[in-house]
Design a protein with these regions (language model features):
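Sequence context surrounding c-type heme c attachment/ligation sites in exported
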Residues: 27-34, 54-58, 62, 68, ...
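Consensus positions within tandem repeat domains that build extended binding/scaffold surfaces
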Residues: 40, 63-66, 103, 175
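Residue-level marker of structural boundaries
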Residues: 9-12, 57, 69, 93, ...
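Electrostatic cytochrome c docking/interface patches
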Residues: 8-30, 45-48, 108-142, 157-160
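The canonical Cys-X-X-Cys-His
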Residues: 3, 7, 26, 31-40, ...
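Axial heme c-ligation environment in periplasmic c-type cytochrome domains
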Residues: 1-4, 15-21, 45-51, 68-107, ...
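Periodic glycine anchor positions in long extracellular repeat architectures
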Residues: 26, 38-43, 54, 70, ...
Length: 208
C-alpha cells in the first residue's frame, strides 16, 4: 500500500500516441465502454472499472487483444477480467481495436490525487480496494519500478511499460495483488505480465 500511495503522487506526462487509428470510428465502438469506464475514460470504482484516460494507445490496444484472446481475463479468480473479455470480443478485428485505442488516447489524462482513505485493502480481484500507507515510505519500494515505468510514472514504450501516474490507487493495488498471486501474468503468452510478476512479488505484504 505504501508503494501504491507513492504512485498516486506521480505526475508523469502521457506518452505520445503511436497508433494511427481512426478515432472517429473508435468513438462509435467506445459507446459500449461508457457505462463502466465513463464518457471521458475516468473510470468508476463502484463498478470496478479503472480509469483508462491517460493510458498510451499501444497499451490499450495490447490489453484489448489480450482480453480478446484470453491471455488476460481467463483466470478463474479474475472476476473483473472475465467481465472485460466479452467486451473486447465485440471488437471485430485489429483495425477496430486500433480505432478505439486511438479514440481513448484523445481523452484528457487528468490527475488522480492521493487517497486520504485508510480502509484495509481487500484480497486480490474481489472488491475495489482502498489503500492506506505512507507515500514517502513507498518511494523506497518504487525504486525497483523506475527502470521501466520511469521516475514520474510516465511509462516507456520501448520497454513496453505503460504510464501508471494518474491511475487510481485502488486499481493499482489490485493489479499488484493479482500479479503477485498469479491471477495476472501467469498465461504462457502474457510475456509482459510474466515480467511484472516477480516485480510484484518483491512487495512483502499489503503494507509494503
Amino acid at each position: 500500500n505504501k508503494v501504491v500511495r507513492f504512485i498516486g503522487t506521480l505526475n508523469g506526462t502521457p506518452l505520445k500516441p503511436t497508433i494511427n487509428g481512426n478515432a472517429e470510428a473508435g468513438k462509435t465502438s467506445y459507446m459500449t465502454c461508457i457505462a463502466c469506464h465513463g464518457a471521458e475514460g475516468e473510470g468508476n470504482k463502484a463498478l470496478n472499472a479503472p480509469k483508462i484516460a491517460g493510458l498510451p494507445d499501444w497499451y490499450i490496444a495490447r490489453q484489448l487483444h489480450s482480453f480478446k484472446k484470453g491471455i488476460r481475463g481467463s483466470h478463474q479468480k479474475d472476476i473483473y477480467g472475465m467481465q472485460m473479455r466479452p467486451m473486447a470480443m465485440t471488437l471485430a478485428n485489429d483495425e477496430a481495436i486500433d480505432n478505439v485505442a486511438s479514440y481513448i488516447s484523445t481523452f484528457s489524462a487528468g490527475v488522480s490525487s492521493a487517497s486520504t482513505e485508510s480502509v484495509e485493502a481487500a484480497p486480490a480481484s474481489t472488491v475495489a480496494v482502498n489503500v492506506s500507507g505512507s507515500a514517502e515510505k513507498g518511494k523506497t519500494s518504487y525504486a525497483v519500478c523506475v527502470s521501466c515505468h520511469g521516475v514520474n510514472g510516465a511509462g516507456n514504450k520501448v520497454l513496453n511499460a505503460p504510464r501508471i501516474s494518474g491511475q487510481q490507487e485502488w486499481y493499482v493495488a489490485r493489479q499488484l495483488a493479482n500479479f503477485k498471486v498469479g491471477i495476472r501474468g501467469s498465461h504462457e503468452e502474457d510475456v509482459y505480465g510474466q515480467q511484472m510478476r516477480p516485480m510484484a512479488m518483491i512487495l512483502a505484504n499489503e503494507q509494503a
